[in-house]
Regions:
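Active-site and adjacent substrate-binding regions of carbohydrate-active enzymes
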Residues: 1-209
Length: 209
């Protein structure tokens, strides 16, 4: 919780204090989000990425999350009751304005939870960090995670290895003379396995941090 200095009122944020949580129990919030979608659709945007969308507050604040090793374990503020119904309305509204590709980042490493948010009526694809955030070059583990994803998800999986939230792929996977070979191997995997590839700007050049 933070206090807003001009009003003296408190506001809630799950992440950075600049990222104020919205109260999705309030119908006016939902309507305002629809107006934001209208703004961008009118300018030709044909897709949206919804960040940590399973953290929407649709069932109130609830009790405090438990603490593990000094960090909160998100338990009561994630995958709340009502969130799927809220997202169904959101996705339905977006598609009523014309075709759009909907991408969700889900704050979970459990494939069954990821699968809840992906369907023809919900998100087209969901990010799977089990694949994308691996810290070392381990082909057998990469293939194992990809196979598990292919079996679990009914829709298309996502394939990415870098993002703004993590070090670049080659900075994690490379080892001097092996940098180029490993970059080629991972990109070949990314572009040939069934799924939707996401290439982070600079990856096509083998860029490092």
């Amino acid at each position: 919780w933070c206090v807003e200095p001009d009003t003296g009122q408190y506001y809630y944020h799950k992440f950075a204090r600049q990222q104020v949580d919205l109260n999705w129990q309030n119908p006016q919030v939902e309507q305002e989000i629809f107006r934001v979608i209208d703004f961008w659709k009118a300018r030709g945007v044909d897709g949206f990425r919804f960040d940590v969308i399973n953290f929407l507050t649709t069932d109130g604040i609830g009790p405090d999350n438990p603490i593990d090793n000094g960090e909160q374990r998100h338990e009561f503020d994630i995958n709340q009751p009502g969130i799927i119904d809220t997202l169904l309305r959101l996705c339905r509204y977006v598609r009523q304005q014309g075709n759009a590709f909907l991408i969700a980042e889900i704050g979970s490493d459990e494939l069954d939870i990821l699968a809840r948010y992906q369907s023809p009526e919900l998100m087209d694809v969901v990010f799977n960090f089990n694949i994308g955030s691996q810290k070392t070059f381990d082909i057998s583990r990469l293939c194992s995670e990809i196979n598990a994803t292919q079996l679990q998800q009914s829709g298309l999986p996502t394939l990415f290895f870098s993002s703004h939230d993590m070090p670049r792929m080659i900075s994690r996977f490379g080892e001097g003379p092996h940098d180029i070979e490993r970059a080629k191997a991972v990109l070949a995997l990314q572009l040939t396995v069934r799924g939707v590839p996401f290439v982070f700007q600079g990856e096509e050049l083998g860029m490092i941090d």
